[in-house]
A protein has these predicted regions:
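Repeat-blade elements of multi-bladed beta-propeller folds
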Residues: 931-933
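Carbohydrate-binding surfaces of carbohydrate-active enzymes
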Residues: 2, 15-20, 24, 30-36, ...
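Short, aromatic- and glycine-rich surface loops/edge beta-strands on solvent-exposed regions
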Residues: 174-181, 723-727, 855-858, 975-977
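Acidic/aromatic-lined carbohydrate-recognition and catalytic surfaces
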Residues: 52-170, 176-205
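N-terminal pre-domain segments of enzymes
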Residues: 1-12
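Extended, non-globular alpha-helical segments
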Residues: 35-43
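Beta-strand-rich ligand-recognition modules
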Residues: 341, 812-876, 938-940, 944-996
Length: 1012
């Protein structure tokens, strides 16, 4: 693809590269509303949607109503050119088919084998136990095991009923271990209805038949054409809800015997206790667990999806916790290998502008999100997943989430390797409690109208990166084998900054997370290498030729990092030894491997340090977390071994990068992870070809030729900004538009635009009615609210957010159980909503309001907390302002002028929408030749500017500066500034500053004084 063709392709990116929404089907599904929302998604730059049953769904799941709704959605998606994706559950986790599986298989929920008793017994002493539950296994082992280890003693024959009596025959202390089976039972505070037993072939098979088979039977003609794939969510072999426990299932011991040719019982004590047999026992058990989870669930889904010609995708529980993911899914890379499209989730940060690298749970056990996304991207590269899907934003600052923060997160994810973004989520409805699920939402959010400011941009990033080829010459060996060998299942933490997974796992987790972050901070291009892929590599001239895209291409590695790795597989050791002996570099951090495992025989063999020609770069006694000096030394060492194609100085660990090849070109991406600008960055790109900067912001993408001194240049990055460069040998005279480089200085002369602005809004002002009085009488409840009002003209709508019964949903009107009075006059009728939500009904009550004190009363049947009778905050909406001067809210006449500043203090405290500021001005006499901009100062949260009706574009992050078109001085122009905020002021407890704060200035510079 020629560069000119690339620029043209970026202008209209196909649907397959555009965001795919998690579209929450969370209410009673109506054909007209479904079609409306799909048209909106198409208009706002989405490429598809995932039809996702969610909390609040009132249509019947996997029944005729669900089929009819999906058929409507598929039909409209075809008309709009959108892809359809399926989601395999009603809410999550996947596996219960909306509860049908648990009804079919009662008592077949997730099963654990739990330590119920652990008793230390002195030599010659007798232990007597009255057990609360009949045990599955009971063992006795020496507290100080011998080498070779003795076979555990089976104490089940010593049981009389549930009474256990046993005398310790050993010369030293013994440990008695009692293991019982436990079924997952939801309780107070547990989010999920229940986890099924994913390791039970009957249960998993029934789920696949009743879900995937249901879709295949009814929509088979659309599968593989209109329907692209099906998403599995948050499944796992064991949820970790009981800590001193392992995953278990019906006939698990018999399956182990069949698969492994030996009994599982001798392994079980060493999953919980330390001893010479522990590491080999753990390796065999956790690998068998992973194999079973894939065979019964993950792989079975892949098989039916392949047969239906659709992608199997999704993310799995605790994939971002390295030690925990061993317990929950066995082997992350093996799971990714058995999907046809790899996916991951990243739901934060919870605070707007918060760090994308920090973790909430301290050093040990912290979620390794950056590492997990890098793992997923590398898995996609090696196993040939066409995309890296990322479920995004779900817990990212709630209703405060704005498009600037969305862009900051997307740029970060793109730098890590994601290239198919799935906003979590877009609500079908925000009625009732649904509005408190997960942002960013769509129709109900003012930001929706500006969505193309991120969807077009993100689609271009995806188009450039999808199907990339790696240029990494540094690889980090993934420590799966070490984690499996050392995973402890402690009863509690050993110290405040530790987990219950053991010291070795804690060290691996903390150091692996920090290493990946440091490689990102320091622009070291790398891949995460699973052992099965490394074992397929060939050694040549001091390099590892690692197969990528299932052998369709290769990645040439010159340095392999072993981070805190204690155990590796035999073939891995042989490959690395050959690599090192042929001039390759193997750097060991904290540990050299001390044991090698043969997965064929199940034998673990000790290694001596002298057996390994590997460099121990970081000694075992180095502190964790490592001091900055260590990472600096590692950076110097890596660059001496493997010169990096990109370097950024003065970035303060806030700028990360990505380098890849595609279409025979090399691309370089830089992203500012901070919500603050990064100035005067020293960038070096080591590429002899001319360098173009791609401008992905414009409606028509453009380029700038980069002027560099031997690949070195200075760069400013604004808050959350992402820039992409391409090395292009044909770039000497680009036949495409040229735009100014970023980071330029401000013009020299300014003119302040002071005084009030003409002001209006794109929707009615709104006032939530809160702090009302509640009365109960027999089976009814009354909510009473008071407010002041002046004489108002025009309609004033009363919005009722009241959960409906099924009969009311079908009829689309409230029954007589709901009555509303305004000043003792009955209000209504209420109709489906147009202001907030279809299911938040509205009635015009302007004729019932009066000057002075007003009283609004709602009476409804049933108990307040019953789902079908819950009354949520009502709202008043209309052409009014809200005065904050009284204890009660007061509706005052609308205004048509507003000063710059916070509009929540000027009559719009709860307004969520677009404020439109207009001003007529005469341009200053700035001469014939000039460059000029409009600087809006500060605002919240995004803005678009029009001059004489012509849009100057959308800005979602500062600086809030817009380049003006060429106009002669003295010209009179109509200036319009539109500012939108988030829904936080409507739904949140306290208004956030919103609007155009200013100061607003015209700024210009005469040509010859320097470029903008």
């Amino acid at each position: 693809m020629e560069t000119a063709q690339l620029i043209n392709a970026l202008e209209n990116v196909p649907a397959e590269f555009r965001p795919v929404s998690f579209w929450f089907m969370n209410h009673f599904l109506q054909p007209d509303e479904l079609r409306l929302q799909i048209r909106e998604m198409a208009d706002k730059g989405y490429g598809g949607f995932m039809f996702h049953g969610r909390d609040g769904l009132r249509s019947r799941y996997l029944e005729q109503e669900w089929e009819d709704a999906l058929r409507v959605a598929i039909d409209e998606a075809k008309k709009q050119g959108l892809d359809t994706w399926l989601y395999d559950e009603n809410h999550y986790p996947s596996g219960i088919a909306g509860g049908k599986i648990l009804e079919q298989f009662p008592g077949r929920s997730m099963r654990s084998l739990v330590v119920s008793v652990e008793e230390r017994v002195a030599p010659g002493a007798t232990v007597r136990l009255e057990l609360a539950q009949a045990p599955r296994y009971t063992f006795a082992v020496p507290a100080t095991p011998s080498s070779p280890p003795a076979e555990p003693i089976n104490l089940l024959p010593q049981l009389t009923g549930q009474h256990l009596e046993w005398r310790n025959p050993f010369a030293g202390d013994a440990v008695v271990l009692v293991l019982v089976e436990h079924l997952y039972q939801p309780g107070p505070g547990i989010l999920f209805e229940s986890y099924p037993d994913y390791l039970d072939p009957e249960v998993a098979g029934a789920f696949i038949r009743q879900t995937h088979g249901w879709y295949r039977e009814r929509f088979g003609a659309d599968l593989g054409e209109q329907v692209r794939g099906i998403f599995t969510d948050n499944a796992c072999a064991h949820f970790g809800h009981i800590r001193r426990a392992i995953p278990w299932s019906r006939e698990f011991d018999q399956r182990f015997l069949t698969a492994e040719g030996s009994r599982i019982e001798p392994l079980l004590p060493w999953l919980f206790l330390s001893g010479p047999a522990a590491r080999a026992s753990r390796l065999r058990f956790w690998r068998f667990l992973g194999d079973e989870f894939i065979r019964i669930f993950v792989g079975a889904i892949r098989t039916v999806c392949d047969d239906a010609r659709i992608f199997s995708t999704g993310h799995y529980c605790l994939e971002d916790g390295m030690g925990e993911h061993i317990r929950q899914i066995g082997d992350y890379f093996a799971v990714m290998k058995h999907q046809s499209l790899n996916a991951v989730d990243q739901l934060g940060p919870k605070t707007k502008g918060g760090s994308l690298f920090e973790y909430p749970r301290g050093i040990a056990g912290a979620e390794s999100l950056t590492a997990c996304i890098r793992n997923t991207a590398s898995a996609a590269l090696f196993y040939d997943s066409p995309r890296v899907m990322c479920e995004s934003f779900g817990l990212a600052s709630g209703w405060r989430l704005d498009l600037g923060e969305v862009r900051r997160i997307v740029g970060f994810l793109s730098a890590l390797g994601a290239d198919l973004f799935v906003p979590h989520g877009l609500y079908y409805s925000i009625a009732g409690n649904r509005k408190w699920e997960c942002t960013p939402d769509h129709l109900h959010n003012p930001m929706w109208d500006y969505s193309r400011a991120w969807t077009d941009w993100a689609s271009r990033l995806s188009f450039l990166t999808a199907g990339w080829e790696s240029v990494a010459e540094v690889a980090v060996l993934h420590p799966t084998t070490t984690l499996q060998a050392h995973l402890e299942l402690g009863a509690s933490k050993t110290k405040p900054d530790a987990t219950d997974l053991g010291a070795v796992v804690d060290r691996v987790e903390a150091t692996f997370r920090d290493l990946v972050n440091e490689l990102l901070y320091r622009q070291v291009v790398h891949e995460i290498l699973p052992e099965d892929v490394l074992q397929q590599a060939t050694v040549a001239e001091g390099t590892l030729r690692v197969p990528t895209r299932k052998g369709k291409s290769t990645c040439t590695v010159r340095c392999v990092i072993l981070l805190a790795i204690r155990v590796i597989e035999q073939r891995t050791l042989e490959t690395l030894r050959q690599f090192a002996q042929n001039g390759g570099s193997v750097l060991c951090l904290y540990e050299r491997p001390d044991a090698v495992y043969d997965p064929v025989t199940g034998v673990l063999t000790d290694l001596a340090a002298g057996d390994l020609p590997f460099e121990l770069f970081v000694p075992a006694d180095e502190a964790v977390p490592a001091p900055p000096e260590l990472w600096q030394r590692l950076d110097v060492r890596l660059r001496a071994l493997v010169p990096q194609p990109l370097e950024v100085r003065n970035s303060h660990c806030q700028v990360i990068s990505r380098v890849w090849e595609k279409w025979g070109r090399r691309f370089y991406l830089l992203h500012n992870c901070s919500a603050k600008p990064q100035r005067n960055l020293g960038v070096t790109i080591r590429d002899p070809r001319p360098l173009l900067r791609l401008d992905l912001e414009q409606s028509t993408p453009a380029t700038t030729t980069v002027t560099a001194d031997h690949g070195r240049f200075r760069l400013d990055l604004e808050a959350a900004e992402t820039v992409v460069f391409v090395a292009d040998s044909t770039a000497a005279a680009p036949p495409y538009p040229v735009v100014p480089a970023a980071g330029a200085s401000m013009p020299e002369q300014t003119l302040a635009l002071s005084g009030p602005w003409a002001f209006t809004t794109n929707k009615p002002n709104i006032l939530p009615l809160r702090n009302g009085a509640i009365q109960y009488a027999e089976c009814k409840e009354r909510h009473a609210f008071t407010l002041h009002a002046c004489e108002l003209s025009g309609p004033v709508w009363l919005l009722v957010d009241h959960e409906m019964t099924r009969a009311e949903l079908i009829c689309q009107r409230y029954s007589s159980r709901l009555k509303v009075w305004v000043n003792e006059q009955l209000a209504g009728p209420f109709h489906p909503g147009t202001i907030l939500d279809h299911w938040i009904f509205e009635a015009d009550v302007a004729a019932l309001l009066r000057p002075g004190l007003n009283r609004v009363v709602f009476e409804t049947g049933g108990i307040f907390l019953e789902n079908d009778h819950r009354l949520w905050n009502p709202y008043l909406a209309g052409a009014f302002t809200v005065s904050p001067q009284r204890a009660r809210p007061s509706l005052t006449p609308p205004i048509d002028q507003l000063d710059t500043g916070d509009w929540t203090r000027q009559g719009f405290p709860c307004f969520a929408g677009e404020g439109i500021y207009r001003k007529t001005l005469r341009l200053p006499d700035w001469g014939e030749a000039r460059m000029s901009i409009l600087d809006l100062g500060r605002l919240a949260n995004s803005a678009v500017v029009f001059i004489n009706g012509h849009s100057l574009g959308v800005r979602v992050n500062p600086p809030w500066r817009f380049t003006l078109p060429e106009m002669a001085g003295g010209t009179e122009v109509q200036l319009e500034v539109r500012v939108i905020n988030t829904p936080e002021n409507l739904f949140g407890p306290k208004p956030l500053p919103s609007g155009l704060f200013g100061p607003v200035r015209l700024c210009w510079k005469l040509t010859g004084n320097g470029d903008l």
